[in-house]
């Protein structure tokens, strides 16, 4: 893994910082694990914008990543590490002893040729997946399930991890990167280690066009719009003279947005601001 700062041969190259990983596979991805991915432009079936700042971008295939890790007690060998345009983390193509291939999230420290395994009695080793009741307290894990059998939902992006800090009865207590502490059923499965490609946060795209390649459109300030487009719009000068709100009139500075009160009882401590 190397961090490369481009020479200022043009305005678009001046600030570019790239993350170069010579271990990544340079060929095509594994075709049986690809799926089509259509562009929506942020519109729904009525043609109305439901998600702003989306449009254009390079064509992509979706990689079918195994978040469930439900192929139990069958060892697998890492064939190669690959780039995935759909996420910040890299992925690993693994070959199981029975001949099946799957993509998994590539944890930090996983290399080509390493052996991994999923199962109740899998050894405590980077890349192995097992229920959290069998993982020692204090361990660092990623791709953590919230419901048994549903597949990993927490700590899946580059450099992400969760720490197991306690185990009581049927639950384990996790400390998330945000500072939140929450209880999860001990039967839920997690993968040992942290997600790789942690240098992803250090990259600098360097120009607006690099975001357009990724299908991200510009974010326009509300105060630069007309009154018909935003509550902050219109008027002379740049002062909109009211409390900041979203385009739909909801307060935007510090207002709580969480609605799922059903699971509040599992949150031991709220995330830090």
Curated annotation (Swiss-Prot):
HAMAP family: Ribosomal_uL2_B. Residues 221-263 are annotated as: Disordered. GO terms for cellular component: large ribosomal subunit. PROSITE patterns: RIBOSOMAL_L2. Part of the 50S ribosomal subunit. Forms a bridge to the 30S subunit in the 70S ribosome. One of its GO terms (molecular function) is transferase activity. Keywords: Ribonucleoprotein, Ribosomal protein, RNA-binding, rRNA-binding. InterPro entries: NA-bd_OB-fold, Rib_uL2_dom2, Ribosomal_uL2, Ribosomal_uL2_bac/org-type, Ribosomal_uL2_C, Ribosomal_uL2_CS, Ribosomal_uL2_dom3, Ribosomal_uL2_RNA-bd_dom. Residues 253-263 have a biased composition (Basic residues). One of the primary rRNA binding proteins. Required for association of the 30S and 50S subunits to form the 70S ribosome, for tRNA binding and peptide bond formation. It has been suggested to have peptidyltransferase activity; this is somewhat controversial. Makes several contacts with the 16S rRNA in the 70S ribosome. GO terms for biological process: cytoplasmic translation. Belongs to the universal ribosomal protein uL2 family. This is Large ribosomal subunit protein uL2. SUPFAM superfamilies: Nucleic acid-binding proteins (SSF50249), Translation proteins SH3-like domain (SSF50104).
